UniProtKB/Swiss-Prot annotation:
The chain crosses the membrane at residues 21-43, 214-233, 249-271, 324-346, 353-372, 382-399, 404-426, 517-534, 541-563, 568-590, 602-624, 639-661, 682-704. Coiled coil: none annotated. This is one of the targets of the anti-tuberculosis drug ethambutol [(S,S')-2,2'-(ethylenediimino)di-1-butanol; EMB]. EMB is a first-line drug used to treat tuberculosis. EMB inhibits the transfer of arabinogalactan into the cell wall. This is Probable arabinosyltransferase A. Residues 772-798 are annotated as: Disordered. It is found in: Cell membrane. Signal peptide: none annotated. One of its GO terms (molecular function) is arabinosyltransferase activity. Arabinosyl transferase responsible for the polymerization of arabinose into the arabinan of arabinogalactan.
């Protein structure tokens, strides 16, 4: 209107001219900040170089020794080998290995490595089972060639028998071999011409040069100076009064207390996330590795451009690795996010909204319901959620106060969010939604020269270059990204719907009822508010601009998720803050909508009931140990034997019918509003509050019940409580897992004086159908399947992921003859000279049965709680909930051996088995089940089933002295902890990586069988650049019997011992020559080999 324009013109005339100095600083510092920060990716860095030379000394016999040097990247940057041809003549006539980069006894040694082999006829050089050059053995031995020269680098791969015509060749560069050391059968002393040089790929081990550091410091100083100058310029303008926030009311304080209290409880008892172990291990090894290496995959590539958060975690881990300490950033982000919602977001949307107690309580309940299922771990979503809500607040501050410095700070925070993880892009959503309003603020200052306006904002964007490239270069970050796309898994943008599909998958953590509810409520609030705004134009009592921008930020954020290369449902956790704010406004808006129309209220309640029905069709599932003791973790919730999902679905149908009746009734009765009474206002405003509170109570109650109800049996909550009580000195699951250090020591001995047949005391007097070799040669277990969307799995996205595996040495086979004539390969390190075997495999004509001799039980002590039996085949057992698993009967019978030499048989007990399989495992018989007078026990086996797949085998009973995993492993032994287990074993040391070479682990800690098959073994695979790349080349495994204290039915996981294929004495760890070189940001040095 003309009057308004006149007043605005008068106000502009009254504006004080901003300081020329401040404007000059804003322009110059902004431009300098952009240029300096933009140069950071290209500036030189100091790259640490590492080289292994061979030979490195001689053995006791005076001959060269082998070396162990497992390269994290697999292939070296360059390999150069020369072998004098006369040295080949020292091999036997049938030949041997002249030189290899993998030991011949390793898994797929030739497929991955380089071998120079000699046989009786020829000498050949092969890279990854592809021959590069071959020469007659006679010509090589006779001295027709001077040397064998082999090379492999980023430009060429080849071999040459110098002096022999047509005995050379080259191969494509993708044939560069894996190097895990230097291995040879040659028995020769060090001599001229016998040499190998391995240049390790250390491109990611970089540190900024003095020049780069100075440029980064100056660039950040310029950015800060530009923003400060912008703030001073903002002060120089007479602006509209900002919308003032009243003092927080009583219900705000009450809600703050409830939300923060719930978050603190969840900090102690809450379930971990699927990537806690992943990020924990990366953080723990980063310091020695020299960069944030991807420990479990991708050939040791850097985590850049998303690595600054792991750097923070690395500093935290240097203080303590206890879960309650490492999860502090997530809990702090949660508290800060909520306080911004309650003190800034809701007041900005409307003072009446913030003062409405139902809106405030609903915001708190919805926030908790959205936060708890996703954000209680070491993943980046908690920080992203905080960044999103902070950016929205700053954007609103900039728009409301007509100042630009809050927008500049918002951009900086958004840049930190973007570099947290790909889903951090959603922090850009508030900036995109508010860009038009901020643009009007910029153009409104037409009294001042316009050239300075975008400079501070552009400088804020340029900070992203410093965050990403602070110690990496443009080339190394590009290479890291390339490897991750080559290896995968990645999902294209047009399959974004899979993220939502994963929420619907049953028997999946991502499809759990709590995560379904959080996302469905977010979508209901978003689309519900948009419908109200489109239908009515505004929400009475709320400011339309901020409300539209809140909805727009959420919608744009969901669209930005399309750009992420992965589609894990857990990434929805980044919307937890927005969900809380939307929940509060939805309760406020729909209270008025419900009062306006009974039909609309019925539709609102029906939608919530349908959400509950859909959500409760999933499991109350949590990741790994988070399930321990939780009700309904493996099935849909039930009440009085009725599925809860059915109850809510029936109620939703009733609500829908009621809404339909009210809709058609309007044609006859006309529009009727609901009486504005306290009761009706409560009915209209509280449905979402009630529903969200139910879900929060379920989440908190489930975990508190698990912690209290199972105490002192292991749970996440009990581990965290122990950490708090011991000031972080407890060792979580390592204090609860019990280990048989030597199964042979716990083996029971038969009572002397008994009679038994040819098969010894284990077979008893007259076994039928059971023999010492009655075990199948192949004990491959049944395939294990998991549904689509399983985190850290590379299975197909549209169908179940199927895998087959068994632990250590439990897969069967043959071995030298044992104590009772058995030729069965024994698991768990059992000594065949002391361990007899009896089995019914192959007996398909008679009902097999056997009763062993009586074995003497030792005195009962706390460290010997179990009788265990190593067994194989199909065995009858009951699970803890009473469900039955079919197999053949293998029982333990208690007895009494009296002084007069007689025996009294007592009760028989079925074993505890952890899951159906044929492979060797340890059956458990708690001594608490034994009658007090029992002092002997025997095995009673009965196999009447003649089917080929129905048989059982067993070894003598054991009563081992058990020690904790912490006592067994200690805190200095190098260990491979799988992704799922790493966060639960904070005291164990992950094997180190230094100068691009991995330390060989001595043990592996594995999660439960299903998790191992469908996640660990796939994600950490050799083909994808995981630790199995060198482990399968250099180590073999042996399973160790373990149990979870007082939770004997639990398949918690297992521990495996690694045994070197080539002993340490024969192939000691290589000495590495360390150096440094200066490289510029564009220097690539060739690609890392990231192919299968």
């Amino acid at each position: 209107m003309p009057g308004d324009e006149q007043r605005e013109r008068t106000a502009d005339d009254a504006v004080t001219e901003p300081s020329r100095i401040a404007r000059l600083i804003a322009v110059v510092a902004g431009i300098a900040g952009v240029l300096l920060c933009g140069l950071v990716p290209l500036l030189p860095v100091e790259e640490t170089t590492a080289t292994v030379l061979w030979p490195q000394g001689v053995g006791a016999d005076g001959n060269v020794t082998e070396l162990t040097a497992p390269l994290v990247a697999g292939a070296p940057r360059a390999l150069d080998v020369t072998i004098p041809c006369r040295a080949v003549a020292e091999l036997p006539a049938d030949g041997g290995v002249v030189f290899s980069t993998n030991p011949a006894g390793g898994i797929e040694a030739g497929r991955n490595g380089m071998f120079i082999r000699a046989n009786a006829d020829v000498v050949y050089v092969a890279f990854r089972d592809t021959v590069a050059a071959v020469a007659p053995r006679e010509a090589v031995d006779s001295g027709a060639c001077s040397e064998i020269h082999v090379w492999a680098d980023v430009s060429a791969v080849g071999a040459d028998f110098a002096g022999i015509p047509d005995a050379s060749g080259t191969l494509p560069v993708d044939k560069r071999p894996q190097v895990s050391g230097v291995f040879t059968d040659l028995k020769v002393p060090a001599q001229p011409g016998l040499a190998a040089r391995i240049d390790i790929d250390t491109r990611f081990i970089t540190s900024p040069t003095l020049l780069k550091t100075a440029v980064m410091v100056l660039g950040l100083a310029c950015v800060i100076g530009s923003i400060v100058a912008l703030a001073l310029l903002d002060r120089g303008w007479r602006r509209r009064p900002a919308r003032t926030r009243g003092r927080a009311g009583l219900w705000t304080w009450i809600t703050d207390t409830g939300v923060i209290g719930g978050l603190l409880i969840w900090h102690i008892v809450g379930a971990p996330t699927s990537d806690d172990g992943y990020n924990m291990t990366i953080a723990r090894v980063a310091s020695e590795a020299g960069y944030t290496t991807n420990y479990y995959r991708y050939f040791g590539a850097s985590e850049a451009p998303f690595d600054w958060y792991q750097s923070v975690l690395s500093h935290l881990a240097s203080i303590s690795t206890a879960g309650v300490w490492m999860r502090l950033p997530a809990t702090a982000a949660a508290i800060a996010t909520w306080l911004i919602i309650s003190r800034c977001v809701l007041p900005r949307i409307g003072r009446r909204v913030a003062a409405n107690r139902v809106a405030m309580l609903t915001a708190g309940a919805t926030f908790l319901a959205a936060w708890l299922p996703f954000n209680n771990g070491l993943r980046p979503e908690p920080l992203i959620a905080f960044a999103v809500i902070t950016v929205w607040m700053l954007v609103e501050n900039s728009i409301g106060t007509r100042r630009l410095w809050p927008a500049a700070v918002a951009i900086v925070i958004a840049m930190f969010s973007v570099t947290l993880a790909p889903q951090g892009l959603i922090a850009l959503a508030p900036l995109l939604v508010g860009a038009r309003a901020i643009g009007r603020v910029v153009t409104a200052r037409r009294a001042a020269p316009g050239s300075w306006r975008p400079c501070p904002l552009a400088a804020s964007v340029a900070v992203v270059f410093v965050i990403i490239f602070r110690d990496q270069t443009l080339a190394t970050v590009a290479e890291s990204v390339r490897i991750k796309y080559v290896v995968g898994p990645t999902i294209p943008w047009y399959q974004e719907f899979l993220r939502y599909y994963f929420l619907t998958v049953e028997d999946s953590v991502d499809g759990s009822l709590t995560r379904r509810f959080a996302v469905l409520v977010l979508l209901l609030c978003l689309f519900g508010l948009i419908m109200v705004l489109l239908r009515r134009g505004r929400v009475p009592g709320a400011v339309s601009g901020p409300l539209w921008r809140l909805c727009g930020s959420t919608a744009i954020g969901l669209l930005l998720l399309i750009l992420t290369p992965t589609k894990w449902a857990i990434q929805f956790g980044a919307f937890a803050g927005l969900a809380g704010a939307l929940g509060g406004v939805t309760a406020f808006a729909f209270a008025r909508v419900g009062l306006h129309s009974r039909r609309n209220l019925a539709l609102y309640v029906t939608a919530l009931l349908f959400i509950l029905a859909w959500a409760t069709s999933g499991l109350n599932g949590w990741f790994y140990v988070g399930n321990y003791g939780v009700p309904w973790f493996d099935k849909q919730p039930v009440i009085a034997h009725y599925p809860v999902t059915t109850i809510f679905l029936v109620l939703a149908i009733v609500g829908g019918l009621l809404a339909g009746w009210l809709h058609f009734r309007m044609d006859y009765a006309g529009h009727t509003e609901v009486a504005d009474t306290g009761r009706n206002r409560a009915l209209a405003s509280t449905p979402l509050l009630i529903v969200a509170t139910i879900m929060v109570v379920l989440e908190l109650g489930s975990m508190v019940k698990a912690t209290v109800g199972r105490y002192p049996v292991y749970t996440v909550g009990s581990a965290n409580i122990a950490a708090l009580r011991s000031a972080g000195d407890s060792c979580a699951m390592a204090d609860a897992v019990l280990v048989e250090a030597d199964p042979n020591e716990g083996m029971l001995q038969p009572v002397p004086g008994q009679r038994f047949g040819d098969y010894g005391p284990l077979g008893g007097e007259d076994p039928v159908g059971f023999t010492p070799s009655g075990v199948s040669e192949h004990l491959e277990p049944e395939p294990v399947g998991t549904n689509p969307g399983t985190p850290n799995s590379e299975g197909p996205v549209d169908k179940p992921n199927i895998g087959i595996a068994y632990a250590g040495d439990t897969g069967g086979g043959y071995a030298p003859e044992g104590v009772n004539g058995s030729r069965v390969f024994l698991p768990f390190g059992l000594d065949p000279s002391r361990t007899p075997v009896m089995g019914s495999y192959g007996e398909n004509k008679l009902a097999a049965k056997a009763t062993s001799a009586w074995y003497q039980l030792p005195p009962r002590t706390p460290d010997r709680p179990l009788v265990t039996v190593a067994a194989a085949g199909a065995i009858w057992y009951y699970e803890e909930d009473g469900s039955f698993n079919y197999g053949q009967s293998l029982k333990l019978q208690w007895g009494v051996h009296r002084p007069d030499g007689t025996y009294q048989a007592l009760s028989e007990v079925q074993p505890i088995d952890i899951f159906q399989q044929k492979a060797w495992r340890n059956l458990r018989f708690p001594l608490a089940w034994a009658p007090p007078e029992a002092n002997v026990a025997r095995i009673v086996a009965d196999d009447p089933n003649l089917s080929e797949d129905q048989w059982c085998a067993f070894t003598p009973p054991r009563v081992p002295v058990l020690q904790t995993a912490q006592q067994f492993l200690g805190s200095q032994t190098p260990v491979l902890m799988d992704i799922a287990t790493a966060a639960n074993f904070p005291c164990q040391r992950p094997f180190a990586e230094r100068l691009g070479v991995a330390e060989l682990p001595e043990y592996r800690i594995i999660p439960n069988f299903k998790q191992m098959v469908v996640s660990s073994n796939q994600w950490q695979s050799a083909a994808d650049g995981g630790p199995f790349l060198f482990i399968q080349a250099l180590l073999r495994t042996e399973a160790i019997p373990t149990y979870l204290r007082d939770d004997w039915y639990r398949d918690w996981g297992s521990i495996e011992r690694y045994i070197r294929v080539v002993p340490q004495e024969q192939a000691p760890t290589a000495a590495i020559e360390e150096g440094s070189t200066r490289v510029f940001g564009w220097s690539r040095g060739g690609p890392i080999r990231a192919l299968p």
